[in-house]
Amino acid sequence: MKTGKFIVIEGLEGAGKSSTHQVVVNTLTEFGIHEVVFTREPGGTPLAEKLRYLIKHEAEELVTAKAELLMLYAARVQLVENVIKPALARGKWVVGDRHDLSSQAYQGGGRGLDRHLMTTLKNAVLGDFKPDFTLYLDIEPEIGLARAKGRGELDRIEQQNLDFFHRTRERYLQLVQQDPNAVLINAGQPIELVQQDIRKAVQKFIEENV
């Protein structure tokens, strides 16, 4: 049996990950790929969902940047080992809403955590496991946050100041440029053009890998 592929959707708040998810699924379906597993990070297993709540909601004490990072990696390893890897081994494709790039950008860039710590933790938890393909939806933080606010109440991370999101975006851009398996999508375009670019990128990946 062929192993499946792991596609990840990344981006700041309000970049359009939810609508991108549907475009990816529709494109996979057009190519006859129906066995798809959907994941989100943090979350995706009973323990990971509990950690998601702790990460995203205000706590009775200060949540330090390192504690936040460690909770994210605890949730991630549960998801990877218990859901993603088994699904890929069964030949299913996995479409993920965020993965390790989010931690590298948000905690490494936004929080300013030490790059050596970030790399060491990533290698210890994930080893050589990584997505086969990443779609990064790039958007100006001001626009993305305005969209996020329009959806309702912001969570603990979404409430960070604008400088935090500019640092996060800057790190995202650096990492995407270094990753040959990542594609940058201009999410500031009209939605029709964004979806068109996503479909083309996914189609190209499928044609080259199936």
From Swiss-Prot:
SUPFAM superfamilies for the chain: P-loop containing nucleoside triphosphate hydrolases
Residue ranges of the TM segments: none
A family per Pfam: Thymidylate_kin
Domain of life, source organism: Bacteria
GO annotation terms (biological process): dTDP biosynthetic process; dTTP biosynthetic process; dUDP biosynthetic process
GO cellular component: cytosol
Reaction equation(s) it catalyzes: dTMP + ATP = dTDP + ADP
Coiled-coil zones: none
EC number annotated for this UniProt entry: 2.7.4.9
UniProt KW Metal-binding keyword: no
Keyword terms of this UniProt record: ATP-binding, Kinase, Nucleotide biosynthesis, Nucleotide-binding, Transferase
One Gene Ontology term of the molecular function aspect: ATP binding
Annotated ATP binding sites: 11-18
Similarity comment: family membership: Belongs to the thymidylate kinase family.
Its biological purpose: Phosphorylation of dTMP to form dTDP in both de novo and salvage pathways of dTTP synthesis.
Name of the protein: Thymidylate kinase
Organism: Histophilus somni (strain 2336)
Species lineage: Bacteria, Pseudomonadati, Pseudomonadota, Gammaproteobacteria, Pasteurellales
